[in-house]
Swiss-Prot record:
InterPro entries the record matches: Bystin
Cell compartment(s), UniProt: Cytoplasm; Nucleus, Nucleolus
Organism in which the protein naturally occurs: Homo sapiens
Tissue expression profile of the protein: Found in the placenta from the sixth week of pregnancy. Was localized in the cytoplasm of the syncytiotrophoblast in the chorionic villi and in endometrial decidual cells at the uteroplacental interface. After week 10, the level decreased and then disappeared from placental villi.
Name of the coding gene: BYSL
Molecular function terms from GO: RNA binding; snoRNA binding
Record-given protein name: Bystin
Quaternary state and interactors: Binds trophinin, tastin and cytokeratins.
Positions of post-translational Omega-N-methylarginine modification: 40
Length: 437
């Protein structure tokens, strides 16, 4: 049988004392139950933390007590109803039930508030420059065609050829619209004629996806749209149309509206200005549909050129599109606005191909026999060309330009142009190699 091992610390004491002795013993009774703290941390700061639910209750009780005190002492009127929590993305505007706004409209309104003075102020035009530009304007300009004119021509073609169904149609066939479609887009027309902010009708947003989008657009009467509706329409068509179709929208809808607004108010509405900037999303269509037709019309005023030119200055434009536009402007018949656009494009300091530079030089050399007094804008454009690209000119071009200065002088600008040309090293002059003996 194994030996019994006594417990440690007991010594010679009895294993179990009598119950009476245990009760009477003072060291056997504990004063209280030991509190166990598990998972509460050791810092007092954590024990004093108030949870979010308790915080809300405290604030609610404090608010109720404050309202009771104000009502009891008569220091406050009827407590105001709790204000609904709203997320505001822009400045407050009076609206009639238009809670859902377009995602970019608050940004546009904020920009209008910040820059309204700059764009709504009248453009300062020098009378002398304006008279000089009018001398080079086309005296018999071609009639301006709008989208309505082209649609009516196509409708007339369709009516004359309706008898021969299988014949070759020279124009775009214009099918008759369903009466329900006409009713829908006449309703869209009413919305766009009064549009200020908010979302556009879904029927209008799907127009770029339609094959006969021009005919549908004609039903909505773009000339009756508000400026804000024109901006939103430009956003939609610039994003969803192909470049060729976007060019037609710019040329037939946006450009006539911009020119009419400038001619009537002597300034451009801010929303139309933003529409011109948004149209640069497709730079090729912008040049072919807005800038080039504006120059080719021969009736571009100085005010129009300054407004459109400011967009060229502010926006980034790919070099290929700018080079093609400069080449086209240099080869067309001259008008005063051409010098403004060329100077602004030259100031962007692109690495232009030699073909474009040669076309620009020939453009200026074509004025050697000009009898009319050239405007200051023409001399400023020539100075910009020489300052930016004097190292890319050939020797014969440099000599021809010096001869041009003698034939078409300007008292202030010609000496500066001559100094730039004389200090430049032509591109066809090679460096003399250094020989070491």
């Amino acid at each position: 049988m194994p030996k019994f091992k006594a417990a440690r610390g007991v010594g010679g004491q009895e294993k179990h004392a009598p119950l009476a002795d245990q009760i009477l013993a003072g060291n056997a009774v504990r004063a209280g139950v030991r509190e166990k703290r598990r998972g509460r941390g050791t810092g007092e700061a954590e024990e004093e933390y108030v949870g979010p639910r308790l915080s809300r209750r405290i604030l609610q009780q404090a608010r109720q007590q404050q309202e009771e005190l104000e009502a009891e002492h008569g220091t406050g009127d009827k407590p105001a109803a709790p204000r609904e929590r709203t997320t505001r993305l822009g400045p407050r505007m009076p609206q009639d039930g238009s809670d859902d706004e377009d995602e970019e409209w608050p940004t546009l309104e904020k920009a209008a508030t910040m820059t309204a003075a700059g764009h709504h102020a009248e453009v300062v035009v020098d009378p002398e420059d304006e008279r000089a530009i009018e001398m080079f304007m086309n005296k018999n300009p071609p009639a301006r065609r709008t989208l309505a004119d082209i649609i009516m021509e196509k409708l007339t073609e369709k009516q004359t050829e309706v008898e021969t169904v299988m014949s070759e149609v020279s124009g775009f066939p214009m099918p008759q619209l369903d009466p329900r479609v006409l009713e829908v887009y006449r309703g869209v027309r009413e919305v766009l004629s009064k549009y200020r902010s908010g979302k556009l009708p879904k029927a209008f947003k799907i127009i770029p996806a339609l094959s006969n989008w021009e005919q549908i657009l004609y039903v909505t009467e773009p000339e009756a749209w508000t400026a804000a509706a024109m901006y939103q329409a430009t956003r939609i068509f610039a994003s969803n149309l192909k470049e060729r179709m976007a060019q037609r929208f710019y040329n037939l809808v946006l450009l006539p509206r911009v020119r009419d607004d400038v001619a009537e108010y002597k300034r451009l509405n801010f929303h139309l200005y933003m529409a011109l900037k948004k149209a640069l999303f497709k730079p090729g269509a912008w040049f072919k549909g807005i800038l080039i037709p504006l120059c080719e019309s021969g009736t571009c005023t100085l005010r129009e050129a300054i407004i459109v030119g400011s967009i060229i200055t502010k926006c980034s434009i790919p070099v290929l599109h700018s080079s093609a536009a400069m080449l086209k402007i240099a080869e067309m018949e001259y008008s005063g606005a051409n010098s403004i656009f060329l100077r602004l494009l030259l100031d962007k300091k692109y690495a232009l191909p030699y073909r474009v530079l040669d076309a620009l030089v020939f453009h200026f050399l074509g004025f050697r026999t000009e009898k009319r007094e050239l405007p200051v804008l023409w001399h400023q454009c020539l100075l910009t060309l020489v300052q930016r690209y004097k190292a890319d000119l050939a020797t014969d071009q440099k000599e021809a330009l010096l001869e041009l200065l003698r034939l078409q002088p300007h008292p202030q600008l010609s000496p500066e142009i001559r100094r730039e040309l004389q200090s430049a090293v032509p591109r066809d002059v090679e460096d003399v190699p250094i020989t070491v003996e």
